Amino acid sequence: WRPSAPIVGLGNVQPSLTVRRDGSVVAWMRDNGPPPHRLLRAESTDRGETWTPAVDSEIPNPGSGAEVRVLRSGEWIFIGNDVENGRHSLAVWMSQDEGETWGFRRRLVEAQAGQGSFSYPSLLEARDGWLHATWSEAIGGRETIRHARFNRAWIRAAGLNP
């Protein structure tokens, strides 16, 4: 084991890694840098030894935790706050081209800005194909952890991402 070269960027932290069919690795990172606030991405073609500089993706990110997973179907799924400011909206996005574009988006939960916070999401695909998401939720002074169970068809039913 040895550490890789750093992923250079403006405010990139907390990576979530995905591996393409060709073996290249994509690091998806929360954005704590200057606007525009987008999920940042960097790529490695040598198993993580070296990385491209972090660049903005099309997905908004207010500097909050996010997770990207590769599903057994080959589709990629992202869960995180889908706004540039605040954590009052949480969504899942789905890509059918290994993260090049994110054609489908479905909101899991939202509140008025300043009236709720949804953070620290996590996602897994169960053996039966169902997707399970958890996140921390704070509304009206109460904090809890929520869980949602859904499938890829539910995400697609929202239609193409505007």
State what each model feature region is.
Residues W1-P162:
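Asp-box/BNR beta-propeller blade signature and adjacent active/binding-site loops
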